[in-house]
């Protein structure tokens, strides 16, 4: 018996050692106290606007490399089909229906003047001859909202914002929402110009980026943002940092460097054919590469979670002046179809996130905050947010995790878009129109382009999804349009 025990001791030691080695690769995911976090939040980038997601016209070697080094999410969604709601959702982990920011926020030069009492607008817009009164949209994200930057500052992070903010005037800028550094973040939803000194052609002093001083006349804005990002990374290399680069590109005005426009003018065009837009995408890619190179040269790559995503679907423009093409998805930015809300998303953290994998699990903007906290703290209480911790999804990209996703837009947008709410449950997507128009039901697995409305053929399924949607609207206390 003694011999057996003596023989078993080395075996047990080996098993314990092997078990420790097996689990050690996951310990970094359990808690990573010195993890750096970079979120690249692109403006208006469509689902197929990069090579890794299907473009054969736009050249994006650095973003494609990022996808090869991490997990690519093909069922990734923006929280809204327009910018401000998605941006607030990313920062707070809360759905636009819950934050109350359900439309894009008007800047000062667009009439976004906050009342003397400092409150966000209440009540309804009458909308002329339209049948619904719609809730007034907020003019700022309240300072009472706790942002991912504030949460990470509490954990000892240096925090930086570069680029577009679009969540209210000066008193609501990034530096008042947890960011130590703010370069370019103001109330504007688009730049007055993409070339230094970034001044409007009409001379409107309210249509400027107040915290982006001129550096070199003629310098391209996306290049400037990339340089500022690298500078922030280098200055904080000895500490842990959170950087949000919310690029102004590829939002209008369409402006690009001449040499890149000439390059794309000379290339064979397909479904995507706008040379200026293509040049803007390439400049974006160049500066993603600039950040990746900086992380490599500073020895920070393996200790940095890098998230790449977009705030809504691509802007297609009109048939006579196409901006981009979102096919096989239907429609574009601002609309309730996949072309308005499905976006490219990539996550990379070498040694912790599988490389070169694709996940089909549905994810949404609000998931970023709880996922980051899960990696930083080792655990997260999801009940505090509308987003979900994606760490299991990321670790097992081959598995498809099911969940319900929701959207809410209680406003009119031009003459085409009426107030709507959406639920995606499994492969099915229901669009409910609040003006009484017939809803739409699509099987996304077999009809990604949303060509065949199945609602009349599946009334029971449609009603089941509608009841889920109505329950969610009540739970979030969503602002609703009302009949006149």
Where do the PLM segments sit?
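A short aromatic-rich beta-strand->coil structural motif
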Residues: 37, 43, 152, 164, ...
